[in-house]
Structures are given as C-alpha cells and as structure tokens.
Amino acid sequence: MNLKQFTCLSCAQLLAILLFIFAFFPRKIVLTGISKQDPDQDRDLQRDRPFQKLVFVIIDALRSDFLFDSQISHFNNVHQWLNTGEAWGYTSFANPPTVTLPRLKSITTGSTPSFIDLLLNVAQDIDSNDLSEHDSWLQQFIQHNNTIRFMGDDTWLKLFPQQWFDFADPTHSFFVSDFTQVDNNVTRNLPGKLFQEWAQWDVAILHYLGLDHIGHKDGPHSKFMAAKHQEMDSILKSIYDEVLEHEDDDDTLICVLGDHGMNELGNHGGSSAGETSAGLLFLSPKLAQFARPESQVNYTLPINASPDWNFQYLETVQQIDIVPTIAALFGMPIPMNSVGIIIPDFLQLLPNKLASMKENFMHLWKLSDHHGEVALDDFTAEDIYTKMYTIQETLTKSATNYNYPLLTLAFVGFLIITIIAIYVLLRYSGPDFWQLRVSSLSVLLVSIILGVSTFASSFIEEEHQLWWWIVTAFSAVPLFVYRLNVLIIVRWFIMMACVRSIKFWNNSGQKFIYSNVMSNLLNQNPSWKWCLNMLTFLVLIMASAGFQVLHFIVTTILVGLCFTYKISWEIVNGNQAEIPLFMHDLLAKIDFAPTESNLIVLARVFFQAWAIVVISRLVLTKLKVLNKNYLIKDMKVYITILLMFQTSSQNIGQFLVFQILESQIFYFFQNIPTASLTSTSKIYFSNLVSLILQNFTFFQFGGTNSISTIDLGNAYHGVSSDYNIYVVGILMSVANFAPAIYWSMLPWSINYASIPAQVKLQTFIRSKLPAFTYHCIFGTCLMTACVVLRFHLFIWSVFSPKLCYFLGWNFVMGLLNGWLPELALLCALD
C-alpha cells in the first residue's frame, strides 16, 4: 500500500464516522408555526394576566446547592425572600447534554434537546441554530407586541434575531478565563437600560457567565465562588428593589435560574446529578400573597442538607416546565413544541386555572399524535397532572428519529474499511497465517478487548481500568523476552514505578472519586508542586545539554517563557500565596508584572517563539545547515515544552515521570534480541505500546468519556476576549490530548533513527497501521453497540459522548497529530 492509497483510506474512515454521527444525532423534527388563541380569548387573557413584566436572569451553571445549601450558598437575600414567601424555589432538572445552547433551546421552546446540539454548541455560527421560525416564549412576547431587551451570553443572538431586541449587549460565552468583566458588561446596563427606562421595556433577559467560568477554572469550591454568589445576590437585590419602587405601576416577575449545574470538577455536559440539577427561583412581591409551595413551607433557608440529597432541594421540576408556566402567567399560548407542564404551585395565580390545565393537557395530547378532544370534566386536577406527566415522559423519551439509511451506509462503509485495514495489517506480518507475528495478533487482541467493552455502559465509563490492565500485562513482557540480569531488573522496576505513579496521579473514570491522589496532594502542598514543576523543566533543559549548543540555548529560552507564564497565570488567578517566595523574586528580577494583559502578551510571545523555532529547525535541517541526527530529539523536546505550556500546574510533574518511563522503554527496544522481532514487528510493537500509553495517560491526566471533563481552562492562553474559535479549538485539543500527543512521539526514535531515506514512507505507513486498525475495529464495535442499544437508558449519557470522543481521537490524534508532525519530520530528514 502506498501513501496515496493509505491517505484515501484514512479520509474515508473519517468520512464514515462523520456520516454515522450525523445519522445517529439527527436534528429533531419540530412542528412549524406559532401557537395562537382565539382573539377574544387572547384579549381576555392579556387583560387578566398575573404579571406585566418579566426579568429573566440566567446565572450560567447555577447548581441547586448554590442557591439553597447552607454549606456553600452565599445568596443571603435570596434566602430571606424564600423564607418570607416573596420567592419560590425549585430544583430544575436539565436534560443532558448539559451545555448552554441545547439548554437555552429547551428553556425557551419547551422542547427536549437533541444530542447534536452538543456539537452545535461549539459551532455556534451554524444557521441551523436559528430559532426565529420556531415557536418560543420570546416569539410569543414578540407576537403580543412586547419589547425585549437583552444583555449577556451571545449564544442568545445565535438563536434569536437581533431585531427582536430593542436593545442588545452580547458577551462572548467561551472566553472562560474571564469571570469579572464578562459579568460587569451585563451589570453596567442595569441603571441606564433597565432602571431609568423602566416603562420602555416589557421583558429583560440577563445572562451572567462569570460563575460558570469560575467553575471551569477552579471548580465549585473555588476561592472566588463565595464572592461571585454575593455579587449575583446583590444584583438580584438591586433589581428587586427597583421592582418594589414600581409596585404600583405594574406587576413584575423575576425568574432566576441556572441553565445547568456543574460536577465537582466545575465542568458540565454530562448527566451526573450535579450537572443536571440547576437552581430555579421565581421572585415577586405578589407571590407573598399566595400559599408557598408545600416543600418550601417545611424548611428555613438555607438548608443544611446531607450528601444523600444528591442536589435535590425543595421540589424538583423539569426545566422545560418553565416555558408553559411563563406562557400562562403572561396570558400567552403555550409554544408549539413545548412538552413542559405548568408548575402546579402557580395555578393559584391564574384567573382560570382549570382552563389553563386543560389547555396544557390538550397541547401535550396533540403532540403525542392523539387527535380529537378528550372529556376532562370527570377528572380532578391531580388526575390531569398524572396524565400530563405520563405523556411528558413518553414525549421526552421519543424525541429522536434516527436516519436509518444514512446509518446503514456509514456502518457498511466503515465495516469495509475495517476489513481492508485488518487485511493490510496481517499482510505485512507474513505471507500466510502460520507466519503471522505476535505483534499483529497483539494489535488485534487489544482492539477486540476494547471493542467488546463498548457493549457495556460501565466499561465505557470506566475504560481507564481496561487500559490499566493492558499496561500492566504489557509491562511483564521484558521479563520473558530478555535474559534477566541486575540492569534489566532495575530498569524494569523503574518502569513499573513510573506506571504506578501515573496511575496514582489523578482520579479517572466517572463512578469513583478518591481524595488521596497525587494531584490533590500537590494542590494541598503548593510548594511541593512548584518545586516538582521546576525540577521537570530543569530536567528537560539538562536533557538537551548533550545535543547542540544552539538547541540548549533555544530550549532554555522556551522553558523560561513557559515557566514564567505558568507562575504568572497562577498569580493573576488569585493563587499568589501558593507560589514560593523565590519564584516571586524571580519575576521581580526580570521586571515582569503579572497582569491579565501581560499574560496574553507573554503567551503570544511564547507561541510565536515556539513556531519560529520549530519551523526554523525543520527548514535548516532540510537545507542541511543543521545536523539531522538530532532532529527527532530536538522536535520531541520542543513539542514537550508546548504540551507542558498547555497543561494544568498539578499535572506538569507527570512529564518528568513520562521522560523517565520513555527512557526505560527506549532502552528495552534498543536492546531487544535481534531474533525476537522482524523490522515490521518492531514497528508494530512500538506503535502498539505508543497507542496503549496514549490512552492510559489520557485517562490518568483526568480525562474520561464524559463531555464534562473536557479541559477548557487551558484553551485560552494568549487569547483575548475577541477570540477566534478555531484557535481556541486547537489549544483545547492540545490541552486535552497532551499526554497522548507526548506518547505518540515514542516510535519516532525507534522507527526512523537508522533507516534509509527510501523506506521512510513505507515505515510511516506501517507505523500507522496498528492505531488505524485499532480504531477501525473499536469503531465498528462502538457503532454496532450504539445501534443495538439505541433505546438503552444510557444511550445519550454514556454511548453518545463516547461516540463524540471517538471522533475526537480519530480527527485530532489519528489525522492531525498522527500525520502532520511526522510527515514534516520525514520531509526534513530526506
């Protein structure tokens, strides 16, 4: 197989994956049109509606305990309003995927999200996100000639036309490094655009992002979280005070909610209790005139809850229930695609609660493909709600229609590619079955083990355990291949110690969390952490000292920039107390002031310097100005520095362990008995070991198969608020796949160090076959599992995220990282 054929095969594989994903995650079929009422009925409802103004406040990632739990909540004014009955509180269940765009669609239309909205959450410029033709409570307000003003997350303007808003001041939602200015940009408009012009608007939408950004950076227990709670609480008080001043003019409802929650790492996107349990609050002086929700009467806020409450405070409602509730409270018809149910506590506010219940029931009845009227006269309110909850459950479960023809095409195409990949892998091993090498059979064995595991949701959630067992098994190989002596045994023990250290470094998987892991110990002892980080950087510099003087100088400069940035980043983000004093003195001596603006400049200087160094090294080697014998070592050092730059401080020390482990593995490959391996077998084995370590370290870096553990905190180095989504995407990919990228370089020195130039391309193709075959076999099993288990309880929370990760591994590691750096290296070596 030549390079052109293999390139076509790889592109076809990626295309088949994309086709399968878009067939498996189709856009939901929604009803077109806008709900309307009889003109006379509409006029009466508008006249008698309980509220005239709506202030809709979204505090991004406002988890339920942030509002209600005494151990973490600092919303003191909210607690007071809840206890006086001016506010009614709930825990709202947010259907996964728990990211902003699909949650906003649900909150405004009342429909359940499709999983493809998770992908569109990043690609927010796609026209299909537009809800201007879909019914929503915003559409209903527009139809009833209400004026809407908006401030906050610019995702709203990707969903709704800007001309719908009398005033709009958007802020970027993905710039997670900022959690101060992003909220000030919203609050600055309150005096002028809301308070002073109170009579000029009917609906105000405020979407605050700062709390979510703090979660992404430091988690729910961040030192910044209490102050952010108090800031949001004071903003709500200022709005409520303004409502009280205008109490005689109109009735205003303030609705405060989180679009989703967050997990204990501060991330979201998955289906854990913390991510799906968002806080919900309705606030108005009028509410004090009615009976409080029964669940609220029994408690004095804040609540001292026990851990087994699992974020369920007061009464739990579906987040989509907000939509018909708002529609009823403002005398509007329920949006066309809403599957929500009016929150029962609000029926007492409605002028005709029985009619509202019946309208809600008939709306759901028709959505469930039933036709004709239903006699509800003999049913009690409880009976009607019981039936509505049953219909709602059915509608939310049957929200997806699969594109079976496209699924079949994609799967058959991928299966054909898999058969070709296995054939090519085995053909290079030997001319017949009896000459098949252990190396190729090992590739198939690992692929089949991981592939079969995809049929069990628990194995997907705890995939790291499988890689741990495989790493442990392969670590025993040197004991059987080499003639044992003291040196071999010592190196083997060092290798095992490194593997165990990596396993101990972070929590991995989704089911169990342990407190005594290395990353937690380092965070609790920051002086140890930074001494270890400094040692890691120094070892990298010293490792380059034996090559060339120019390389040593360049490495020292890059390491200096990287280390200075990592220290400065901690200081700017409020962790200056964790930085040892001598490092503060170091910054003072180089006259660098750690500020947010200086951080952006420093990061850009690093990236530019790194790019110049890498490109220059490749070009000068190609021109034979620099010695090509050191090119592979030099490039590995430069790439490692970039990976450390994109790594969180508690994980930088892992690269020291990586370097020690790599040196032991390299020794074993260099000294393997000649009779034990053919050249092809050596290529296969080195790349199989690389593949195993890529996956093993990915999980031990803190990665999982859940969307919620994607690292966004390191995706904005050098990025200002006016960011480029493609740059952020590249930085995010490097940050999340940093350990995998490191181990993808392992075979370079083994496979390319001493082979003739004319066989380098064939070596490249053979080196890609193990990973390519693995992804083909694993992907075939995963696709089969997704189709067979498409009605499984965990299809959206476990299998679908894994499908997205599979795409990421193939695109980032298989295509971008697997091809571009290595081909550039081979081109320079010619």
Swiss-Prot record:
Fetch the InterPro entries from UniProt.
Alkaline_phosphatase_core_sf, Phosphodiest/P_Trfase, PIG-G_N, PIGG/GPI7, PIGG/GPI7_C
Pathway field of the UniProt record reads: Glycolipid biosynthesis; glycosylphosphatidylinositol-anchor biosynthesis
GO biological process terms on file: GPI anchor biosynthetic process
What EC number(s) is this enzyme filed under?
A: 2.-.-.-
UniProt modification remark: N-glycosylated.
Q: Which cysteine pairs are covalently linked by disulfides here?
A: none
List, alphabetically, the GO terms of the cellular component aspect: endoplasmic reticulum; endoplasmic reticulum membrane; plasma membrane
Cytoplasmic face of the membrane = 343-405, 461-469, 555-598, 673-682, 746-768, 827-830
**Known function:** Ethanolamine phosphate transferase involved in glycosylphosphatidylinositol-anchor biosynthesis. Transfers ethanolamine phosphate to the GPI second mannose. Although not essential, addition of ethanolamine phosphate to the second mannose plays an important role in cell separation via the GPI-based modification of daughter-specific proteins.
Protein name per Swiss-Prot or TrEMBL: GPI ethanolamine phosphate transferase 2
